[in-house]
Amino acid sequence: ITMKIGVMSDTHGSLPYFEKALDLLKDCDVLFHIGDVLYHGPRNDLPEGYNPKGVIKEINNLDNIIIVRGNCDADVDQMVIKHPIEDGYILTEVGNVTFLLNHGYLESKEETIRQAKDKGANVLILGHTHVKELYMDEDLVVLNPGSTSIPKDGSHSVAIIEIMPIEGNHHEVDMDINLIDIN
């Protein structure tokens, strides 16, 4: 069975872009939100359709989402969001692939990549920069889905990861990762 993971980050309280992202990711088995969920933070302009309460409602309607704490996420957010907002590094496995999720602001990227390799991750997913990235560092896939609502590289974006079992092989999988613009 093919597993689909939807990845978004840095929604910063924009309801229209959160809804557009959800629409693109509606067929996914699980969602990863890589942080900066509700607030725009002191360095960003207000995103289009800024409506943290609306985003809370949408998030609380979702069943299968993992949320990483970003630098703009406050303690109070956990009182209104029913899913855990996890600090630091989250190691999780989906379809035989090990993911390390981290917002990407606490340590240097080099250190975060080293952590991912030390923890045996196949894929490291970061946010924070609002810039899309997808590349290999030795055997590690490094992905940043960019920002859903306040991109710094011109286009609002999400990512979809597809994990397909290989016939007759219980350990290896094929993986496709696509960055998708949501303009």
Residue ranges and their predicted role:
Residues 4-12, 97-105, 141-146, 179:
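Active-site-proximal beta-strand elements of phosphoester/diester hydrolases
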Residues 4-94:
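Core catalytic region of metal-dependent phosphoesterases/phosphodiesterases
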Residues 12-19, 39-41, 72-78, 106-111, ...:
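Active-site environment of divalent metal-dependent phosphoester hydrolases
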Residues 32, 66-68, 125, 141-143, ...:
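Hydrophobic/aromatic beta-strand patches that form the interior of the parallel beta-sheet core
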Residues 79-84, 122-124, 150, 167-169:
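Short linear motifs in intrinsically disordered
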Residues 82-131:
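Internal catalytic-core helix/loop-beta-alpha segment
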Residues 95, 114, 119, 136-138, ...:
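Binuclear metal-dependent phosphoesterase catalytic core
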